[in-house]
Curated annotation (Swiss-Prot):
Family: Belongs to the universal ribosomal protein uL30 family.
Species per Swiss-Prot/TrEMBL record: Exiguobacterium sp. (strain ATCC BAA-1283 / AT1b)
GO terms of biological process kind: translation
Ribonucleoprotein found in the keyword field: yes
Name recorded for this polypeptide: Large ribosomal subunit protein uL30
UniProt cross-references to PANTHER family, sorted A to Z: LARGE RIBOSOMAL SUBUNIT PROTEIN UL30M, MITOCHONDRIAL RIBOSOMAL PROTEIN L30
InterPro entries noted in UniProt: Ribo_uL30_ferredoxin-like_sf, Ribosomal_uL30_bac-type, Ribosomal_uL30_CS, Ribosomal_uL30_ferredoxin-like
Stored Pfam families: Ribosomal_L30
Subunit composition and interactions: Part of the 50S ribosomal subunit.
Domain of life: Bacteria
Cysteine-cysteine disulfides: none
GO molecular function: structural constituent of ribosome
Organism taxonomic ancestry: Bacteria, Bacillati, Bacillota, Bacilli, Bacillales
Gene: rpmD
């Protein structure tokens, strides 16, 4: 099953509350922090919501 490596590349300062909550829900707290999450519809939806703040790489295992 594929996984996604998500890195927070832009700050959430000055962003709407919904975007801040989405970034926190993805497990990101600090700039340049990377988390590995499963590749599913829910995660893809959250990534689309904050795509301008994060970078995503696909990991094949």
């Amino acid at each position: 099953m594929a996984k996604l490596a998500i890195t927070l590349t832009r700050s959430t300062i000055g962003r709407p509350e919904g975007q801040r909550v989405t970034v926190r829900t993805l497990g990101l707290r600090k700039m340049h922090q990377t988390v590995v999450v499963p590749d599913n519809v829910a995660m893809r939806g959250m990534i689309n919501k904050v795509s301008h703040l994060v970078t995503v790489k696909e990991i094949n295992e």
